[in-house]
């Protein structure tokens, strides 16, 4: 299932951050889950679509697409 949300914050140096979903939950995102070529980063407030999978520490985003 594909969801949409806004990037709550993303640390480009460490390569991870969180996406805020409409239901108020935050989903972990790692740079390796961002689609596209080149340097993979997200900007705070940027809208994205993504799927959710269960990671070792809870839900995490995969197939993240910048909208």
Curated annotation (Swiss-Prot):
Primary location recorded for the protein, binned into one broad class: cytoplasm
Subcellular location(s) of the protein: Cytoplasm
MF annotations from Gene Ontology: DNA binding; nucleic acid binding
Gene3D superfamilies reported in the protein's UniProt record: 6.20.370.130, Nucleic acid-binding proteins
Keywords per UniProt: Activator, Cytoplasm, DNA-binding, Transcription, Transcription regulation
InterPro entries from the UniProt entry: Cold_shock_CspA, Cold_shock_domain, CSD, CSD_CS, CSP_DNA-bd, NA-bd_OB-fold
One Gene Ontology term from the biological process aspect of the record: regulation of gene expression
Domain CSD, first and last residues per copy: 5-64
GO cellular component: cytoplasm
Function, in words: Can bind to ATTGG and CCAAT motifs (Y-box motifs) of single-stranded oligonucleotides.
Self-association state and partner proteins as the record states: Homodimer.
Name of protein: Cold shock-like protein CspE
């Amino acid at each position: 299932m594909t969801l949409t949300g806004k990037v709550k914050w993303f640390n480009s140096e460490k390569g991870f951050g969180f996406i805020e979903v409409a239901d108020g939950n935050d989903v972990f995102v790692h740079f390796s889950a961002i689609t596209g070529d080149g340097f993979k980063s997200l900007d705070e407030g940027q809208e994205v679509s993504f799927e959710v999978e269960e990671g070792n520490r809870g839900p995490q985003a995969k197939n993240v697409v910048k909208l």
